Regions:
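Autoinhibitory N-terminal propeptides
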Residues: 12, 16-92, 124-139, 155-157
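Protease zymogen maturation seam
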Residues: 83-103, 114-170, 176-189, 295
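Subtilisin-like serine protease catalytic core
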Residues: 157-269, 296, 332-335, 345-346, ...
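Hydrolase catalytic cores
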Residues: 235-238, 258-265, 285-289, 312-313, ...
């Protein structure tokens, strides 16, 4: 008797076609054309095809023939980038190789999804993604609250009695540009004296006359956008000239800033991640990102990892102004300090996002600061909160010049003040606004607390990755202490869901010195899923990390169990079978699911699905593209797809 596995997809059926067909089509829920730069795609070539890559393009007949049909042109996005030092791969935090990233622009009247599909099918690329347009995390003006109350609340003024920063410490302001003639900003610009205005690239960095920053979109030194004051506003918070008897005070005090303009000429934040690379490459050890998007991307992950791991820069980003728990990027990427906002009463700012991804809070309401042209205004948003942390990071980094970026980030988080959680209006956000409110003084002066982070988080079952009712999940991670020694460290797992029973909820870390790591792979946390777990149940796991001296910090892991899709994993081949008539991925934008993949080549297609046709009609039932970006939804789920063993004799 032979056992054979069969994937059963329960689909809506009926006697006549007219009874089943759902005529309505729907736009893709993940992004629209307005969310992306038109006819532009970010591509990363797989390392095994490095020999095909040149500064001018990719030496592939198939790729070049396709580019010819779509009027496409490739450009190496970061031509000055170098491959990471091999030693960086030996540490817990892995570097990013951005040397094989290209940007494709095409002229044909084709939707992004169709071009991405064709490129993905070649198997040459790690990823092919839209170039998402970022949004600034800014709220409207409120002229009745003009003051700098946050300086005292964050104890920045007391911190200045300890340390006032250093002019060699530079904050990269990746934003809409800066009013370089603003009386409160001009003195703190970091000038590149090695490249005077003479039409020559004197310093050989690939940029001509980049004396005071760079305009990434226009590829020139015009870093001022008279129509958009966002960058001028955020810059003043971190970097305004302090103790000069006029205007406002920047938290970074003596620390300088480098303006890196990322918008086009009509206000679209279209070269945001490119700006991060420029800042990192030009010596900025702190980089502020008061912008973001609800769309994650592999391109974004690469850039953040490059800045933090390869270039040792602290990256700070706004949590977003959507007043929800949805992740916002780059703030929610690993290694970024994710900053939410409070109002003057220490309540969560009405617009600030919140959630398990938040690291720290600062102030995002009633912020009085610099504005175009050479003036001041009161405004807010998490755009304002992020540069407060950036200014503090610059102070701290210059105070401890040998500290690495991640150590600085952990010190800022571990010294944050959690007292604001006691404000009644904040009780509903318990643990979801980070470790606490930025405390600049304590960040400079605390010499006792360790800081343990959980890296490489993973959830596994019986290796089919389906997480079904009755399964036992094994949750693992690598725990690293970034700062001072920790004694008697313990990790305790909790989950509030009634469908998760934890049978191994603690792991002993023992004693960890600075930079020590320990993994629980051999002794994982174990969680049993209830037999009555509903379909697509979200679970949120909370890891409380404690150590002697009152140290206590939270880490989170979230996943969806009993999904309405199934991974069929046989040898080197993985296929995801959803319950809605699609194949490979549940949704038309290649998520969620593994697609149809072989070894480490990634999915061999972008979208696929079952189709039934009636020649006499002619009519077709399917869940694939109609006229992009519209997508047919003719099939529906009766029961979730499941795997079962049957006897074949």
């Amino acid at each position: 008797m032979i056992k054979k596995y069969v994937a059963l997809a329960a689909l809506v059926t009926a006697v006549s076609f007219s009874a089943i067909a759902q005529v309505a089509q729907y736009a893709l829920p993940n992004f629209t054309d307005a969310d992306c730069e038109a006819k532009t795609i970010n591509l990363k070539v797989k390392d095994q095809y490095r020999n095909l890559c040149t500064a001018a393009g990719i030496n592939s007949t198939a790729i070049n023939n396709y580019l010819g049909t779509i009027g496409g042109a490739l450009q190496l996005t970061f031509p000055n980038a170098k491959q990471p030092d091999k030693k960086l791969y030996e540490q817990a935090e892995k570097p990013a190789d951005i040397t094989l990233i290209y940007r494709l622009k095409y002229t044909a009247n084709l939707p992004l999804r169709k071009v991405i599909n064709a490129l993905t099918a070649t198997g040459l690329f790690v990823y092919a993604e839209p170039n998402y347009i970022m949004q600034k995390c800014y709220t409207v003006n409120d002229a009745s609250l003009g003051n700098q109350y946050y300086i005292g609340q964050l104890k920045a003024d007391q911190a200045w009695d300890v340390w006032k920063g250093d002019t060699n410490m530079v904050i990269g302001i990746t934003d809409s540009g800066v009013d370089t003639n603003h009386v409160d900003l001009k003195p703190n610009i970091k000038y590149n004296y090695n490249d005077p205005y003479n039409g020559i690239d004197d310093d050989g960095d690939g940029y001509i006359d980049n004396r005071r920053g760079w305009n990434i979109w226009a590829n020139n030194d015009n870093v001022y956008d008279a129509q958009d004051s966002h960058g001028t506003f955020t810059t003043g918070i971190s970097s305004a000239k302090t103790d000069n008897g006029i205007g406002v005070a920047g938290i970074g005090f003596k620390c300088k800033f480098l303006p890196v303009r990322l918008d086009d000429n009509v206000g679209n934040y279209i070269r945001a991640y490119d700006a991060v690379v420029y800042a990192a490459d030009h010596g900025c050890k702190v980089i502020n990102c008061s912008w973001g998007s609800r769309f994650p991307s592999n391109f974004g992950v690469d850039i953040i990892n490059y800045a933090v791991i390869n270039k040792d820069a602290v990256v700070i980003a706004s949590a977003g102004n959507d007043n929800n728990q949805e992740p916002f990027y780059p703030a929610s990427f690993q290694y970024v300090i994710n900053v939410a906002g409070l109002n003057q009463s220490n309540q969560k700012s009405p617009t600030s996002s919140w959630g398990a991804n938040i690291d720290i809070v600062a102030y995002g309401s009633g912020i009085y600061n610099t504005y175009n042209p050479n003036t001041y205004v009161t405004s807010g948003g998490t755009s304002a909160a992020a540069p407060m942390v950036s200014g503090a990071a610059a102070l701290l980094r210059s105070y401890y010049p040998t500290w690495k970026a991640l150590k600085v980030a952990e010190q800022l988080k571990v010294t944050a003040d959690p007292a604001f959680y006691s404000v009644p209006q904040n009780l509903q956000y318990a643990t979801k606004l980070g470790k606490g409110r930025l405390d600049v003084l304590k960040a400079l002066t605390d010499t006792t607390s360790p800081s343990i982070a959980m890296l490489n988080k993973a959830a596994k079952d019986n290796n089919d990755r389906n997480f079904l009712p009755g399964d036992t999940l094994r949750l693992t991670g690598l725990f690293k202490n970034y700062i001072r020694p920790a004694t008697n460290g313990v990790v305790t797992l909790t989950c509030t869901s009634p469908y998760a029973t934890i049978i191994n909820n603690t792991f002993s870390l023992g004693n960890l010195n600075q930079n020590d790591t320990i993994s629980n792979t051999s002794n994982p946390f174990k969680v049993i899923l209830a037999n009555n777990t509903p379909v697509n149940t979200p679970l949120e796991f909370k890891f409380a990390i404690t150590a002697d001296g009152g140290y206590n910090v939270l880490e989170w892991m979230a996943d969806t169990v009993n999904r309405n899709r199934m991974n069929i994993d046989v040898g080197n081949v993985v296929l995801t079978v959803p319950s809605n008539g699609s194949v490979g991925f549940t949704n038309p934008y290649a998520t969620p699911g593994a697609g149809f993949s072989y070894k480490d080549y990634g999915s061999l297609f972008y979208t696929s699905g079952f189709m039934v046709g009636e020649a006499a009609g002619p009519k077709v039932m399917d869940n694939v593209y109609a006229t992009p970006p519209n997508y047919d939804a003719d099939w529906g789920q009766v029961n979730p797809v499941r795997r079962r063993a049957i006897d074949v004799t």
